[in-house]
Amino acid sequence: MTQTAHPDSVLIVDFGSQVTQLIARRVREAGVYCEIVPFQSAEEGFNRLQPKAVILSGSPASTVDEGSPRAPQIVFDSGLPVFGICYGQQTMCMQLGGKVESGHHREFGRAFLDVDKDCQLFEGLWSSGSRHQVWMSHGDRVTALPDGFEVVATSSNAPYAFIADEKRKYYGVQFHPEVVHTPDGAKLIGNFIHNIAGIKGDWSMSAYRQKAVDEIRKQVGDKRVICALSGGVDSSVAALLIHEAVGDQLTCILVDHGLMRKDEAANVVAMFREHYNLHLLHVDASDRFIGELEGVSDPETKRKIIGRLFIETFEEEAKKLGGADFLGQGTLYPDVIESVSFTGGPSVTIKSHHNVGGLPERMKMQLVEPLRELFKDEVRALGRELGLPDSFIGRHPFPGPGLAIRCPGGISREKLEILREADAIYLDEIRKAGLYDAIWQAFAVLLPVQTVGVMGDGRTYEFVCALRAVTSVDGMTADFYHYDMEFLGRAATRIINEVRGINRVVYDVTSKPPGTIEWE
């Protein structure tokens, strides 16, 4: 059995909760490496990772239903500290001899926890007699504790809201400490990791960088690697890491589909060629892409055309180079986590980047994915470690299909150029106002609508530009950014005055849900 090279790590057993990734985020924020494994393969994951502690996640399942998920017995036989969250608490109790019943009073949302007794997990945080806000989301509840456990905190609807077996270092909570609505939740998880499990928390991007470089060198040897460089943070960090490991054995290919932001392709090429000495091939395929996209209005059809053309173009350029044995990709950890079905086997849903999906199979190449253990914020930290400037690392997310999905309806070179100029002015105003880093994502959209206007003494009939800006933590939910009207007026005036083809500007005040961040 191959063991993962992380001597101080935490195993998270996933029972299908929608917020399991947040548990991993909290553990990583505490400076400790962790992995999420579905309950069906948790024993294999345990043996491979050799963790110092185990966390059991929540689940939409009910512990009282026949065939509901269970933790592998090795978790409890190992003598390691265990932290059960919501469903994780319930299955731990049942497996150790306690009882769980379907609750008559379901508890969802904010609740208040009354601490009845001091415990090691509360050290430096909570004390007996105090009250704290937590976030509940459960129907079942524990009704009888296993031997060795005691209640340390309760809520109005959960008499076993926080239980502990201090001798065996088993802890169970009915609430969700991983969500931001439990203000002290991250600290509780940190206490479990550091104080209870005795893990130092010295996992760093510097250590990850060296480990990744060593692994790339071992995997690649003296063979060649090609990497699809989009200009985004993920592919850029992956390319720099691979280049650090194998140097000139790496060739990067930037397929310029003509759908990037103003001057973006030129800036990316200049940065990587001049500052990082990467062997970078810049392929101008804009005529090919825009030619096939012209007149196509369905957004999904646009995406499919762009994905197909990217694969074809990349494949052709790679063949001109004589091929390669390995393909470098900026795959992140959320892309490779298995989605867990608690009623059956795990259904693996690996999201392929729109423009590299299918390439390894078609070109018979092995994947090099040096970021596959990292979350997005960790990739940014690694980028800083590698010397990428904050101005690049902190850029707003940009979709793979580019401006094609910010131009609803049919596209043309003329429309793309209008949109490119409007978007550049909008982002320039945001930066001048010092708002760029406070906004998750901001962009302009060129609507397939023309309106009547008056400019000078003449009548105009030109396009409408919509401005979009949102705040978000992870992109899963988002709220529109609350600009002051003076800023919006200034940005709109510049766009109308400086961009020929636009005579009206509107601001999108839709949150996600019900809307999405992008328009298509």
UniProtKB/Swiss-Prot annotation:
UniProt xrefs under PROSITE patterns: GATASE_TYPE_1, GMPS_ATP_PPASE
Pathway: Purine metabolism; GMP biosynthesis; GMP from XMP (L-Gln route): step 1/1
Keyword list, A-Z: ATP-binding, Glutamine amidotransferase, GMP biosynthesis, Ligase, Nucleotide-binding, Purine biosynthesis
Signal peptide start and end residues: none
List of residues binding ATP: S230, G231, G232, V233, D234, S235, S236
Biological source species: Rhizobium leguminosarum bv. trifolii (strain WSM2304)
Domain (GMPS ATP-PPase) ranges: 203-395
Active site per UniProt: C86 (nucleophile), H176, E178
GO cellular component: cytosol
InterPro entries: Class_I_gatase-like (IPR029062), GATASE (IPR017926), GMP_synth_C (IPR001674), GMP_synth_GATase (IPR004739), GMP_synthase (IPR022955), GMPS_ATP_PPase_dom (IPR025777), NAD/GMP_synthase (IPR022310), Rossmann-like_a/b/a_fold (IPR014729)
Purpose: Catalyzes the synthesis of GMP from XMP.
Protein's UniProt keywords contain Mitochondrion: no
Keyword presence, Transcription regulation: no
Subunit-structure text: Homodimer.
Listed GO MF terms: ATP binding; GMP synthase activity
Family matches, as Pfam families: GATase (PF00117), GMP_synt_C (PF00958), NAD_synthase (PF02540)
EC number: 6.3.5.2
All residue ranges annotated as the Glutamine amidotransferase type-1 domain in the record: 9-202
Catalytic activity, as annotated: XMP + L-glutamine + ATP + H2O = GMP + L-glutamate + AMP + diphosphate + 2 H(+)
Name of the featured protein: GMP synthase [glutamine-hydrolyzing]
Lineage: superkingdom: Bacteria
